[in-house]
Structures are given as structure tokens and as C-alpha cells.
A protein has these predicted regions:
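Short hydrophobic beta-strand segments in globular cytosolic domains
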Residues: 39, 72-73, 82, 131, ...
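Internal helical hairpin/lid segments
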Residues: 56-79
Length: 152
């Protein structure tokens, strides 16, 4: 019937934006990402203990690490903390830059939320930072944000 009426999945999504297909094709990272003061960000020279406090306060399960130019240069997650503790890292004497994951997966704000789900599943990650064209953090989102949006 869709073919006979020349009605595409995109047309259906626009006609039914609240439905599952509509959410998959019409919700973008920019629609669900945390921005501004809600972004968990520290510099690479921040102590791991202070970085953990910021990560806990922002409640995304991750923290972005920026360099001196404000570019995202790394990420540190709840899982990274567990691995650090297992390796005997002293959170009181360590800078987050020495234990961060360099070159994290990032996305532009125009990425469809459904594509973010695929990226997260493919790389077994729970969150991702949104960056602008220059590589500066513009937002962040995690799996719970996608579930709340009805995309996951």
C-alpha cells in the first residue's frame, strides 16, 4: 500500500511523530543531549578525585576531558574508574589526563538518535559526547536519555 501511494517511511514518521518509527526518524542528538552547566567537563590536569566529583554531580556516568584549547581530548567513565581501581590507581594522586580514554567516539548534534543507539551498541559504550565542527564539546547523552526519548 505504501508503494502504491508513493508513501515512504519518512512520510509515515512525519505523519506519526509520536510513534516508534517517528521517534527513530525524527529525534536527533540535539533533542536529547545535556548542554551548558549540565555538561560534565574538566581539564586534563584536573585531579582524578575532582573529576570524579564532577562526574557524580552531573550524573551521566562519564566526564569529558578538554585540552588547553577547549577541545575534547578524552573521556573517563564509570567503567574506567572500576578498571583504574583494579589496577591500583591512587585517585588522590592522579590527574585525569593520565587515565582518560583518548580519542573518544563523538557525534555531531545532527546525528539521528537511532544512529546514536547503533553507535553505542556497536562499540559497547553507554554514553557519547556531542562536539561542534571544531571538536569542542556541545553536549552529551547516555543510554538513559535515549530510553527516555523512546528511541532505545
Amino acid at each position: 500500500v505504501l508503494k502504491a501511494r508513493d508513501f515512504s517511511a519518512d512520510d509515515f514518521a512525519r505523519s506519526h511523530p509520536g510513534g516508534a518509527l517517528g521517534r527513530r526518524l525524527l529525534v536527533y542528538a540535539r533533542d536529547v543531549m545535556h548542554t551548558g552547566d549540565a555538561l560534565p567537563l574538566v581539564t586534563h590536569t584536573t585531579s582524578l578525585l575532582d573529576a570524579l566529583a564532577e562526574m557524580s554531580a552531573k550524573r551521566l556516568g562519564m566526564i569529558g576531558i578538554i585540552d588547553d584549547d577547549g577541545l575534547l581530548c578524552g573521556i573517563y567513565t564509570d567503567g574506567d574508574l572500576r578498571r583504574s581501581l583494579n589496577q591500583g590507581v591512587d585517585v588522590n594522586r592522579c590527574e585525569v589526563g593520565s587515565v582518560m580514554v583518548q580519542k573518544p567516539h563523538t557525534i555531531p548534534a545532527t546525528t539521528l538518535a537511532a544512529e546514536v543507539v547503533e553507535l553505542m551498541q556497536r562499540h559497547s559504550i553507554n554514553g557519547v559526547f556531542v562536539v561542534d565542527a571544531d571538536g569542542r564539546p556541545a553536549g552529551a547523552l547516555n543510554a538513559l536519555d535515549l530510553i527516555r526519548a523512546g528511541v532505545f
